[in-house]
């Protein structure tokens, strides 16, 4: 692991392997270690960069939590690429990370070679979902990460995988319970106020794009992935069977093969 102070915040990251850079952006409320199966498989042929977003993992907390905007997460990563002297790169993000890379494309479209969206969506939240993010943020600051983590583990992965893949479940709980409640809450509030990427960004994306989703994802169901594909000009959709919201951990062999096949083809 390494650290860099960029955009006014300390960002923790790993950089592994040689080749064309591939940047992997984690979801909420996780950290860079969610990409371990991908780092192992991809670093033979790609230069893999896995940052902890601000407020997550070992990265710093924003000094002004109320002033954090969703685009700050993307600016941090772009500044990290500047720090690493990486001009162009492939980009993959899961869930919130998928929206972070949409914002990265909005800010710096010429730097991105391809986009890989995993278990994410582009449109605005419904009023109920938006309000729910604020409610959850307040809850995390009051209760900490423990109760929330125990409650959502059966939605993060398929319920049967909690027992049939105990290593995956333990890893998820470790990440979630190890996340700063303040960092997680800041991200929820910032995400609630993001722009409409479906209307404002997707129509501008012409580079090769891969959309992936777990067949049993409860947070971002297959219909959301299909909506992405319908609104992208140069897109392939892959549905990972027997996986929930985190196919890169639940079915990492199928996930990794789909990513590598896509990157080789472009």
For each predicted feature, which ranges?
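Alpha/beta-hydrolase fold catalytic core
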Residues: 1-22, 44-46, 82, 86-87, ...
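Active-site loop/oxyanion-hole signature of alpha/beta-hydrolase fold enzymes
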Residues: 7, 36-93, 108, 257
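Active-site glycine-rich loops that stabilize anionic/oxyanionic intermediates
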Residues: 27-30, 95
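Flexible "cap/lid" loop of the alpha/beta hydrolase fold
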Residues: 99-107, 111-149
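Conserved alpha/beta-hydrolase catalytic His-Asp/Glu region
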Residues: 125-131, 142-204
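Short beta-strand/loop motif that positions the catalytic acidic residue
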Residues: 205, 211-213, 217
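Conserved alpha/beta-hydrolase "acid-adjacent" motif
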Residues: 218-224
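Catalytic active-site module of serine/aspartate enzymes centered on a nucleophile-bearing elbow/loop
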Residues: 235-266
């Amino acid at each position: 692991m390494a650290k860099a102070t960029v955009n006014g915040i300390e960002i923790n990251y790993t950089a592994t392997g040689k080749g064309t850079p591939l940047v992997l952006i984690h979801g909420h409320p996780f950290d860079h270690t969610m990409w371990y199966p991908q780092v192992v498989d991809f670093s033979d042929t790609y230069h893999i960069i896995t940052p902890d977003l601000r407020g997550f993992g070992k990265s710093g907390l924003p000094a002004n939590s109320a002033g954090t905007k969703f685009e700050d997460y993307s600016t941090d990563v772009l500044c990290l690429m500047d720090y690493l002297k990486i001009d162009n790169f492939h980009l993959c993000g899961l869930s919130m990370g998928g929206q972070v890379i949409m914002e990265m494309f909005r800010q710096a479209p010429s730097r991105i070679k391809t986009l890989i969206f995993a278990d994410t969506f582009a449109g605005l939240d419904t009023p109920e979902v938006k309000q729910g993010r604020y409610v959850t943020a307040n809850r995390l600051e009051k209760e900490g990460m423990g109760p929330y983590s125990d409650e959502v583990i059966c939605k993060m992965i398929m319920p049967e995988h909690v027992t049939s893949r105990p290593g995956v479940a333990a890893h998820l709980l470790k990440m979630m319970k190890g996340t700063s409640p303040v960092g997680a809450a800041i991200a929820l509030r910032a995400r609630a106020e993001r722009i409409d990427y479906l209307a404002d960004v997707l129509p501008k994306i012409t580079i090769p794009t891969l959309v992936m989703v777990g067949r049993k994802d409860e947070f971002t169901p297959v219909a959301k992935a299909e909506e992405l594909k319908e609104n992208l000009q140069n897109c392939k959709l892959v549905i990972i069977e027997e996986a929930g919201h985190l196919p890169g951990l639940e079915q990492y062999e199928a996930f990794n093969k789909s990513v590598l096949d896509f990157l080789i083809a472009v």
